[in-house]
Amino acid sequence: MNPASTSHATLQGLLRHARQRLEAAEVDAPRLSAEIILCHALSLRRIDIMLTPDRIVEEADCILFSELVARRATGEPLAYIVGEKEFFGRDFAVNPSTLIPRPETEHLIETALESLRSGPARFVDAGTGSGCIAVTLCAERADLSGLALDMSAPALATASHNARRHGVAQRLAFVRGDFTTSLLRSGSLDLYASNPPYISEAEYTGLSREVRDFEPRSALVPGDTGLEHAAAIIAEATRVLRPHGILLMEFGCMQGADMASLFTPYSTLWEMVEVRRDLAGLDRFIFARRNLLQP
């Protein structure tokens, strides 16, 4: 879009040019992307575009819109362009330091809420990223509190912002650390939740450009196999969970059998280890419950 030709641009005209540009760039859902970017750039609702398609747009707004569309045409995720992503009915700030929350992780939240005992409970969210798991758990239940871990200081700052945004910051502690960070007493938690990096090096090269070229590699790839963090998470969860405490850990849809096998050294300490599926019917996360024995 040529900024010099935008002095009399209308909403529908901008939308048409943006859609054509995004179609040419082979971006997913080009019309929807154009509408969302236009609403973001002009602080509009989508209904405003429908009701006033011939509204004249100021040149400065046209230029801003054109710049944002150009970013989308490179494959940059829409969530990074508008600065947020919806998760479990709430908007979360995201940026290139954080993984963009995925819908399949919402099933982990649902399982946690269904499985936790009533009354006050404590959890850890290891590899918190945007904080979507930790913040959502606290927002859904006022009697939950927890610790959110991440190695990325910018990600922790984003997660802390999201906690304040949704009014749960007083029940969350944000700490820089990895999956081996032992900050908690043995037997002190009711839930260990984690969506760790689990993409293998081979899988990474085949990811879409939106993921591979823009989302933080460290939040996606732990090493050659994709399972490099899993054993450490299981060991730490075995230590810090109370009797009947729950481990929920997300993984890749082809990793279920390998993930379950990592519990073998701790088989006497877990009363239940299950591979759970997401709403698409794909293996997606481990559900495990500690027994009464101490490690």
UniProtKB/Swiss-Prot annotation:
Catalyzed reaction equations: L-glutaminyl-[peptide chain release factor] + S-adenosyl-L-methionine = N(5)-methyl-L-glutaminyl-[peptide chain release factor] + S-adenosyl-L-homocysteine + H(+)
EC number: 2.1.1.297
Superkingdom to which the source organism belongs: Bacteria
Keyword tags: Methyltransferase, S-adenosyl-L-methionine, Transferase
Residues that coordinate or bind substrate: 195-198
First-level EC class: transferase
SUPFAM superfamilies: S-adenosyl-L-methionine-dependent methyltransferases
Binding-site residues, S-adenosyl-L-methionine: 127-131, 150, 179, 195
GO molecular-function terms, A-Z: protein-(glutamine-N5) methyltransferase activity; protein-glutamine N-methyltransferase activity
GO biological process: methylation
InterPro entries per UniProt: HemK-like (IPR004556), N5-glutamine_MTase (IPR050320), PrmC_N (IPR040758), RF_methyltr_PrmC (IPR019874), SAM-dependent_MTases_sf (IPR029063), Small_mtfrase_dom (IPR007848)
Family according to the record: Belongs to the protein N5-glutamine methyltransferase family. PrmC subfamily.
Stored PANTHER family: HEMK METHYLTRANSFERASE, MTRF1L RELEASE FACTOR GLUTAMINE METHYLTRANSFERASE
Protein name: Release factor glutamine methyltransferase
Species per Swiss-Prot/TrEMBL record: Nitratidesulfovibrio vulgaris (strain ATCC 29579 / DSM 644 / CCUG 34227 / NCIMB 8303 / VKM B-1760 / Hildenborough) (Desulfovibrio vulgaris)
